[in-house]
Amino acid sequence: MHARRSFLAVATFAVSATALAAQNAPQAPPVTVGGVVYTQYQYTDAAVHTNTFDVTRAYVNVLGRFSNGITTRLTTDIIPSAATNQVIRLKYAFAAWTPTGSSLTYKLGMIHTPWVDFEETLWDYRMQGTIAVDRNPIGGPSTMTAADIGVGVDGHWNGERINGQFVIVNGEGYSGGTGDFRKDVEARVSVRVQPTNDNSRVGGLRVSGYAGIGKVTGTGADRNRYLGMLSYKTVQYTLAGEFVSVKNGAVTGSIISAFGVYHLSSPSKIAVIARVDVFDPNTSVANDGNTRIIAGASYQLSPNVRLLADLDRLKGQGGATAINQALFQAQFVF
């Protein structure tokens, strides 16, 4: 009987200790802070040769996750400036709500626009530079921007087989001010028509489309963008091609971009990349565009550090002299 009482006492103590440990276990913090840094060495063979060390981007992300499906994000974007050392600006600042069991997430504030983040996720080499629609200026600093101020909804269905986004925004991007009473409407939809071993929101054989319809601040001229993309992504490689039609008032331009990424094995720390962008700011004017060719190889030094060596060649039409860049770039995530 004494042994039985001792056993019961030990068992009761063990259960109590386990329950107490569970109560005292550290909870995931509701707010986390992280960052992404892109830095590089660049040599350019322009008329005046240049070679520079740069920090091309430094993002600080503050993410909040709270009860009832509420999340928040604040992202600062630190960029180089010719006049001063660095410039700090706001890139994302929004609250989001995902109702319990819903496939939709509602956002308010300075939010992602539908396309740029989607394509950057597919390409996965933002460290090299901006994608074609964010790099080539037709009707502004860039044809599309990554963020804008407004409201939107993201959705995904059937394990990301279909995903999309719809927003109503000012239309001036995250660095262009608030604009006027006119607003832009933008939407994206992506459909996985064939699965692969990559079941992410960009994985598989996909057909994706985007439309952005708006008016230029002040003049009210058309500011429309239409894009179609066909992409194929597995764990080992990515292939994609897109066509973009851009209308600003009476001027229509176009962008064609194709890119690929190949990992030498699956998984592998080494990958090779290639991209071609063909830019025509006005389809009614001859020899006013340019072609950019990018090729390089990357090495994943650790989960937090990626290195990239690449060549970037920009050739204008009409006999313009090509500009070649050799770059050694690094991405740090923390």
How does the language model describe each region?
Residues 261-308, 312:
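Outer membrane beta-barrel transmembrane domains
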Residues 44-48, 81-84, 174-177, 216-219, ...:
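A generic structural signal for short coil/turn motifs at secondary-structure boundaries
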